Amino acid sequence: MRIILLGAPGAGKGTQAQFLMEKYGIPQISTGDMLRAAIKAGTALGLQAKAVMDAGQLVSDELIINLVKERVTLEDCKNGFLLDGFPRTIPQADAMKEAGINVDFVLEFDVPDEEIVKRMSGRRVHAGSGRVYHVVFNPPKEEGKDDVTGEALSIRADDEETTVRKRLDIYHQQTEPLVGYYKKEAELGNTRYSKIDGTQQVAEISKQLAVLLG
């Protein structure tokens, strides 16, 4: 079961990734984790990546693809894997295909921008404990204060509305074209593509995914 998750930041991919990992016994492959692990292990690719990053440059698609190729051969990937946050662009998707990394399912989590802004900009955090609230969906007992300590809640920089909108713009420009790419791949019989309504309840989405993936 080799799965790619697509969708804007805040569309609920992370929550469902946890469900899919547990249900199918597959690891989530994150390019950031992969880079850190390769650098820590001192592999040939890790050393290449470290040199590039130390020079303050971006790691090339080719290097990332080679890391993915190496990662999917490990024992924990024998039943499949879950890719979230990669590929981000069509050249990356093409490179993956050329490298022979095939995918069984591409799942797009569809949530309107305004709903994502509401979800993310409404988050409030208690810095000391990491407890997370939401002004609409999970409000604290007293506005702006942590339930346990009574201390003030704050907004993470990532959750500021302007930041959220910037991240959405990048997603629409860079990553959304992959939706069309994978729809076409599905028409050619190379993968299966499904669009999920990400505005539904978490449990409902999990139930749909279980039916869809079997």
Swiss-Prot record:
NMP: region residues: 30-59
Pathway noted in the entry: Purine metabolism; AMP biosynthesis via salvage pathway; AMP from ADP: step 1/1
Binding site for ATP: 10-15, 123, 132-133, 200
Disulfide links within the chain: none
Region (LID), start-end ranges: 122-159
Major localisation: cytoplasm
GO BP terms in the entry: AMP salvage
Single GO cellular component term: cytoplasm
Pfam families xrefs: ADK, ADK_lid
Binding site for AMP: 31, 36, 57-59, 85-88, 92, 156, 167
Keyword Zinc: no
SUPFAM superfamilies: P-loop containing nucleoside triphosphate hydrolases
Comment block on domains: Consists of three domains, a large central CORE domain and two small peripheral domains, NMPbind and LID, which undergo movements during catalysis. The LID domain closes over the site of phosphoryl transfer upon ATP binding. Assembling and dissambling the active center during each catalytic cycle provides an effective means to prevent ATP hydrolysis.
NCBIfam families, A to Z: adk, PRK00279.1-1, PRK00279.1-2, PRK00279.1-3, PRK14527.1
Protein name: Adenylate kinase
Organism: Tolumonas auensis (strain DSM 9187 / NBRC 110442 / TA 4)
Gene: adk
